């Protein structure tokens, strides 16, 4: 390859990268502009304070409220700290105003399991599921504990017709 050809090819490559980056940025900005202009069917949305923490964590329409619970590192009733990486979850049971929620924790890598030995599949896997019982009328968490432990990247899952939870590892 001649020196002149090399420089022409290099200039063309640099120019195409600059154009592709500009086009990608323009596409991203247009997508954000479109998302910002979408109106809620329930009216305009605005920051709303969490009833548990007082923090503005969500944007909601007028008249809507929420209460957060089961934060990472909160102590559960079984003496275990709530794992992080909250992910897929579902309501598996109801009893009056109480719902039982099973929540996946998509923890990957070599981390110690969070649950007791009796419910741990692999002691060097930090994922699993937790069970939370929440009273929707009182707006408070009633119980929480480890459900399974020692799995990897529990991401998706689903409630079965029998009111149980299937958790799926993302490996």
Regions picked out by a protein language model, each given a short descriptive name:
Residues 20-60:
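C-terminal segment of N-terminal export signals and the immediately downstream linker at the start
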Residues 54-72, 79-80, 135-148:
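Blade-edge beta-strand/turn elements of extracellular beta-propeller
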